[in-house]
Amino acid sequence: MNIYEETKFIMKKYNVHANKKLGQNFLFDEQALDTIANEVTLEDTIIEIGPGLGTLTAILLQKAKKVIAVELDPKMVEIISERFKMYDNIEIINEDILKLNINKLAPKAKVVANLPYYITTSIVTELIKANITDITILIQKEVAERICAKPGDKKAGAITYFVNYYADAEIVTNVSKDSFIPAPEVESSIVRIKKLPEPRIKVKNEELLFKLIKENFTKRRKTITNSLSQSIPKNKLLEILSELGLPESTRGEELSLEIFAKIADLC
Protein backbone atom coordinates (compact mmCIF):
# COMPACT_ATOMS: atom_id res chain seq x y z
CA MET A 1 0.00 0.00 0.00
CA ASN A 2 1.54 3.33 -1.06
CA ILE A 3 1.03 6.57 0.88
CA TYR A 4 -1.83 7.74 -1.35
CA GLU A 5 -3.67 4.46 -0.81
CA GLU A 6 -2.90 4.55 2.91
CA THR A 7 -4.28 8.10 3.17
CA LYS A 8 -7.51 7.13 1.42
CA PHE A 9 -7.77 4.01 3.61
CA ILE A 10 -7.41 5.98 6.85
CA MET A 11 -9.93 8.59 5.71
CA LYS A 12 -12.42 5.83 4.91
CA LYS A 13 -11.70 3.86 8.09
CA TYR A 14 -12.36 6.83 10.34
CA ASN A 15 -14.96 8.43 8.06
CA VAL A 16 -13.13 11.76 7.96
CA HIS A 17 -12.71 14.49 5.39
CA ALA A 18 -10.37 17.45 5.28
CA ASN A 19 -11.71 20.34 7.33
CA LYS A 20 -11.66 23.41 5.08
CA LYS A 21 -12.09 25.79 8.02
CA LEU A 22 -8.85 24.45 9.49
CA GLY A 23 -7.07 24.54 6.14
CA GLN A 24 -6.50 20.78 6.05
CA ASN A 25 -4.90 19.20 2.98
CA PHE A 26 -3.34 15.77 3.44
CA LEU A 27 0.09 15.38 1.82
CA PHE A 28 0.79 11.98 0.25
CA ASP A 29 3.88 12.76 -1.87
CA GLU A 30 6.59 10.44 -0.51
CA GLN A 31 9.48 12.51 -1.86
CA ALA A 32 8.09 15.70 -0.31
CA LEU A 33 7.54 13.95 3.03
CA ASP A 34 11.11 12.63 3.02
CA THR A 35 12.43 16.11 2.18
CA ILE A 36 10.55 17.66 5.11
CA ALA A 37 11.99 15.07 7.49
CA ASN A 38 15.43 15.02 5.89
CA GLU A 39 17.38 16.82 8.63
CA VAL A 40 15.74 15.04 11.58
CA THR A 41 18.12 12.90 13.66
CA LEU A 42 17.78 10.44 16.55
CA GLU A 43 18.96 13.19 18.90
CA ASP A 44 16.11 15.55 17.99
CA THR A 45 12.89 16.42 19.73
CA ILE A 46 10.43 17.46 17.02
CA ILE A 47 7.39 19.67 17.46
CA GLU A 48 5.03 18.74 14.64
CA ILE A 49 2.27 21.29 14.09
CA GLY A 50 -0.92 19.96 12.55
CA PRO A 51 -0.07 16.27 12.10
CA GLY A 52 -3.50 15.53 10.63
CA LEU A 53 -3.79 11.84 9.76
CA GLY A 54 -0.22 11.21 10.92
CA THR A 55 1.43 10.56 7.56
CA LEU A 56 4.49 12.69 8.35
CA THR A 57 4.31 11.70 12.01
CA ALA A 58 4.94 8.06 11.09
CA ILE A 59 8.21 9.06 9.39
CA LEU A 60 9.28 11.36 12.22
CA LEU A 61 8.72 8.68 14.85
CA GLN A 62 11.26 6.48 13.08
CA LYS A 63 13.87 9.26 12.86
CA ALA A 64 13.50 11.39 16.00
CA LYS A 65 14.11 10.90 19.69
CA LYS A 66 10.66 12.31 20.45
CA VAL A 67 7.73 13.84 18.55
CA ILE A 68 5.42 16.37 20.18
CA ALA A 69 2.37 16.47 17.91
CA VAL A 70 0.21 19.59 18.36
CA GLU A 71 -3.18 19.17 16.69
CA LEU A 72 -6.24 21.42 16.96
CA ASP A 73 -8.76 19.02 15.40
CA PRO A 74 -10.02 16.52 18.04
CA LYS A 75 -10.91 14.00 15.34
CA MET A 76 -7.32 13.96 14.09
CA VAL A 77 -6.11 13.60 17.68
CA GLU A 78 -8.32 10.53 18.00
CA ILE A 79 -6.85 9.05 14.82
CA ILE A 80 -3.18 9.58 15.61
CA SER A 81 -3.69 8.50 19.23
CA GLU A 82 -4.92 5.15 17.97
CA ARG A 83 -2.40 4.88 15.12
CA PHE A 84 0.62 5.45 17.33
CA LYS A 85 -0.53 3.99 20.66
CA MET A 86 2.36 1.50 20.59
CA TYR A 87 5.01 4.24 20.36
CA ASP A 88 6.60 5.59 23.53
CA ASN A 89 8.32 8.55 21.83
CA ILE A 90 5.21 10.58 20.98
CA GLU A 91 3.28 13.18 22.97
CA ILE A 92 -0.01 14.39 21.50
CA ILE A 93 -1.43 17.78 22.48
CA ASN A 94 -4.95 18.79 21.41
CA GLU A 95 -4.51 22.56 21.25
CA ASP A 96 -3.99 25.59 19.03
CA ILE A 97 -0.22 26.09 18.69
CA LEU A 98 -0.71 29.85 18.99
CA LYS A 99 -2.19 29.40 22.47
CA LEU A 100 0.76 27.39 23.77
CA ASN A 101 4.03 28.55 25.29
CA ILE A 102 6.26 27.00 22.64
CA ASN A 103 9.40 27.27 24.76
CA LYS A 104 7.79 25.16 27.50
CA LEU A 105 6.95 22.29 25.13
CA ALA A 106 10.59 21.28 24.96
CA PRO A 107 13.79 23.02 26.11
CA LYS A 108 15.37 22.40 22.71
CA ALA A 109 13.36 21.32 19.69
CA LYS A 110 13.05 21.56 15.94
CA VAL A 111 9.73 22.35 14.30
CA VAL A 112 8.28 20.49 11.34
CA ALA A 113 4.87 21.37 9.93
CA ASN A 114 2.47 21.29 7.02
CA LEU A 115 0.91 24.64 7.88
CA PRO A 116 -2.61 25.85 7.05
CA TYR A 117 -2.22 28.61 4.50
CA TYR A 118 -4.50 31.07 6.28
CA ILE A 119 -2.40 31.21 9.45
CA THR A 120 1.16 30.71 8.17
CA THR A 121 2.52 34.18 8.94
CA SER A 122 1.24 34.18 12.53
CA ILE A 123 2.77 30.78 13.26
CA VAL A 124 6.12 31.59 11.62
CA THR A 125 6.31 34.81 13.63
CA GLU A 126 5.68 33.02 16.93
CA LEU A 127 8.14 30.23 16.13
CA ILE A 128 10.92 32.69 15.38
CA LYS A 129 10.17 34.63 18.57
CA ALA A 130 10.50 31.37 20.52
CA ASN A 131 13.75 29.51 21.14
CA ILE A 132 13.34 27.42 17.99
CA THR A 133 16.49 27.38 15.87
CA ASP A 134 15.41 25.02 13.07
CA ILE A 135 12.06 25.21 11.29
CA THR A 136 10.95 23.18 8.26
CA ILE A 137 7.50 24.01 6.93
CA LEU A 138 5.33 23.21 3.94
CA ILE A 139 3.40 26.34 3.00
CA GLN A 140 1.74 28.14 0.10
CA LYS A 141 4.33 28.90 -2.60
CA GLU A 142 3.46 32.60 -2.77
CA VAL A 143 3.98 32.99 0.98
CA ALA A 144 7.20 30.97 0.79
CA GLU A 145 8.54 33.33 -1.86
CA ARG A 146 7.65 36.30 0.33
CA ILE A 147 9.33 34.81 3.40
CA CYS A 148 12.48 33.91 1.45
CA ALA A 149 12.70 37.11 -0.59
CA LYS A 150 15.43 39.64 0.07
CA PRO A 151 14.43 42.94 1.69
CA GLY A 152 13.88 45.42 -1.13
CA ASP A 153 12.70 42.78 -3.61
CA LYS A 154 9.30 43.21 -5.27
CA LYS A 155 8.00 40.05 -3.58
CA ALA A 156 9.06 41.21 -0.13
CA GLY A 157 6.59 42.03 2.63
CA ALA A 158 6.76 42.80 6.33
CA ILE A 159 7.32 39.10 7.11
CA THR A 160 10.39 39.15 4.81
CA TYR A 161 12.12 41.74 6.98
CA PHE A 162 11.09 40.03 10.23
CA VAL A 163 12.47 36.66 9.14
CA ASN A 164 15.60 38.19 7.62
CA TYR A 165 16.34 40.03 10.87
CA TYR A 166 16.39 36.82 12.88
CA ALA A 167 17.17 34.00 10.45
CA ASP A 168 18.24 32.58 7.11
CA ALA A 169 15.39 31.17 5.03
CA GLU A 170 15.39 29.19 1.80
CA ILE A 171 12.95 27.36 -0.42
CA VAL A 172 14.13 23.74 -0.52
CA THR A 173 11.72 22.56 -3.21
CA ASN A 174 8.26 23.15 -4.63
CA VAL A 175 5.37 20.70 -4.18
CA SER A 176 2.58 20.25 -6.71
CA LYS A 177 -1.00 20.81 -5.59
CA ASP A 178 -1.68 17.32 -6.97
CA SER A 179 0.32 15.92 -4.04
CA PHE A 180 -2.53 16.55 -1.60
CA ILE A 181 -5.98 15.22 -0.75
CA PRO A 182 -7.91 17.32 -1.48
CA ALA A 183 -5.79 19.31 -3.92
CA PRO A 184 -5.48 22.96 -2.82
CA GLU A 185 -5.98 25.73 -5.35
CA VAL A 186 -2.33 26.81 -5.21
CA GLU A 187 1.15 25.29 -5.37
CA SER A 188 3.21 24.76 -2.21
CA SER A 189 6.86 24.99 -1.17
CA ILE A 190 9.01 23.45 1.52
CA VAL A 191 10.85 26.19 3.40
CA ARG A 192 13.73 25.75 5.82
CA ILE A 193 14.41 28.51 8.35
CA LYS A 194 17.61 28.54 10.42
CA LYS A 195 17.66 31.06 13.24
CA LEU A 196 20.83 33.11 13.59
CA PRO A 197 22.76 33.13 16.91
CA GLU A 198 22.17 36.89 17.03
CA PRO A 199 19.94 39.23 14.98
CA ARG A 200 21.42 40.13 11.62
CA ILE A 201 21.82 43.80 12.53
CA LYS A 202 21.83 45.91 15.68
CA VAL A 203 18.99 48.32 16.36
CA LYS A 204 18.13 50.33 19.47
CA ASN A 205 14.43 49.48 19.48
CA GLU A 206 13.27 46.26 17.78
CA GLU A 207 9.62 46.97 18.51
CA LEU A 208 9.81 50.33 16.74
CA LEU A 209 11.70 48.81 13.81
CA PHE A 210 9.00 46.23 13.12
CA LYS A 211 6.23 48.76 13.73
CA LEU A 212 7.70 50.99 11.00
CA ILE A 213 8.14 48.07 8.61
CA LYS A 214 4.58 46.86 9.18
CA GLU A 215 3.17 50.36 8.68
CA ASN A 216 5.14 50.74 5.48
CA PHE A 217 3.82 47.53 3.94
CA THR A 218 0.21 48.37 4.71
CA LYS A 219 0.77 51.31 2.35
CA ARG A 220 3.53 49.85 0.21
CA ARG A 221 2.78 51.90 -2.93
CA LYS A 222 3.07 55.22 -1.11
CA THR A 223 6.25 57.17 -0.53
CA ILE A 224 7.89 56.66 2.82
CA THR A 225 6.93 60.18 3.91
CA ASN A 226 3.29 59.08 3.69
CA SER A 227 3.55 55.45 4.76
CA LEU A 228 5.36 56.28 8.02
CA SER A 229 3.48 59.48 8.82
CA GLN A 230 1.56 57.87 11.70
CA SER A 231 4.72 57.10 13.65
CA ILE A 232 7.12 59.85 12.61
CA PRO A 233 6.21 63.55 12.21
CA LYS A 234 6.77 64.60 8.62
CA ASN A 235 9.38 67.24 9.45
CA LYS A 236 11.36 64.72 11.48
CA LEU A 237 11.07 62.12 8.73
CA LEU A 238 12.33 64.61 6.14
CA GLU A 239 15.34 65.32 8.36
CA ILE A 240 16.07 61.59 8.63
CA LEU A 241 15.78 61.06 4.87
CA SER A 242 18.13 63.99 4.26
CA GLU A 243 20.66 62.61 6.74
CA LEU A 244 20.53 59.22 5.01
CA GLY A 245 20.76 60.76 1.54
CA LEU A 246 17.34 59.47 0.47
CA PRO A 247 14.94 61.47 -1.72
CA GLU A 248 11.41 62.28 -0.51
CA SER A 249 10.05 60.12 -3.32
CA THR A 250 11.57 56.96 -1.79
CA ARG A 251 9.15 54.08 -1.28
CA GLY A 252 9.64 51.90 1.77
CA GLU A 253 9.42 48.72 -0.28
CA GLU A 254 12.72 49.73 -1.90
CA LEU A 255 14.61 49.93 1.40
CA SER A 256 16.94 47.40 2.96
CA LEU A 257 16.61 46.12 6.50
CA GLU A 258 19.68 48.18 7.43
CA ILE A 259 18.06 51.42 6.22
CA PHE A 260 14.87 50.73 8.16
CA ALA A 261 17.03 50.14 11.24
CA LYS A 262 18.81 53.47 10.71
CA ILE A 263 15.46 55.26 10.38
CA ALA A 264 14.28 53.64 13.63
CA ASP A 265 17.51 54.62 15.41
CA LEU A 266 17.22 58.25 14.26
CA CYS A 267 13.63 58.68 15.46
How would you name each of these model-derived features?
Residues 215-267:
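C-terminal lobe and adjacent flexible extensions of AdoMet/dcAdoMet transferase-like proteins
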